[in-house]
Amino acid sequence: GRAIAIALRKALADAETPADRVDLLAPFGTGTRNYDAAEAAAWNEVFGSRLSEIPAMTTRGAIGVNGAGTGAIDFAATVTALARNTIPPSLNTSNPDPASRFRFVQDDPKDARITHAVTVSYALAGGQTAALVVRKVEE
């Protein structure tokens, strides 16, 4: 989880966005005990007690892990949620590990004013981790 926490912190710093401005999280969420525990520890480290207050979404329960394309798919889903102010439900996430403290949207899409979102992706074999902050620009 250390690389994920570093990527999250660097993305927030590069975007000049404090963690308390983020209103949508898009964790990778493999659905496997060890990977999810490491990822949850990273998100908990960066977002602290606020983690359980921020809506979260993941595409993993709907489409699984898609190799190198997973990050691009998650980015597209995150941008779409931001543009539509609608958070899609995270399928097959009804029993997440309580230690993760993610607040996944369940069952139906949720309308929400989203201005800043964070998505993360990493290689399951290790070595590559990326996080992006997406910000809505008002015209």
What are these regions (language model features)?
Residues 1-139:
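Conserved "HGTGT" condensation-loop signature of ketosynthase/thiolase-family condensing enzymes
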